[in-house]
Amino acid sequence: TDCPPHFYSAGENPLYPAYKKVIGYINEVCARFEGSRAEVRVAVLYHAEAEWSGKKFMSVDKVAGELLRRQIDFDIIPEDSLYSSEEEGSLQLNGNRYAVLIVPRREYLPEKLSRALETVSAGTEVLYAKESRLASLGKYLQGKGLASVDFMGQYPFIRARKARKGGKDIYMLHNEHPSAAVIRWKVAGCT
């Protein structure tokens, strides 16, 4: 028996003929992003405590879906990180300063969390998301220039990631729709 199974086998495994191409693509993407820094300016609070409380809450997935449809890059951060932000009066984690923190709707907001959100709000805009207002939240964030790319039109199935490396912008776009898409976007400094 072959234990563990060898998927790659130097690209010669007949069960996985395209595996060599997949690995080559992954290596290319990793090489391009190696040493880069993502420019993430939006954080979404993951409220595990709200999920455990038995009270009503909005899933982080709903907020994430709206942000993804609008090409707004974000980090999901745990509640604990608000208590240890690197800078008083704003949300800064791992050298990344967030312009906006989104708090998904929850029925109960603990006093400790409420105080932390108040402290963070001095330098980071804190927005409370509701299911009925997700589309307007996405539009608001786009209007603030927080999308990774400035598309000329709506492309809800395109996912975008922007990073900087060596003073240059790097973009990764991924189409999650089964059909091809032709997109146009504005890039600073280009006409």
Where are these regions (language model features)?
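Carbohydrate-binding surfaces of carbohydrate-active enzymes
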Residues: 1-191
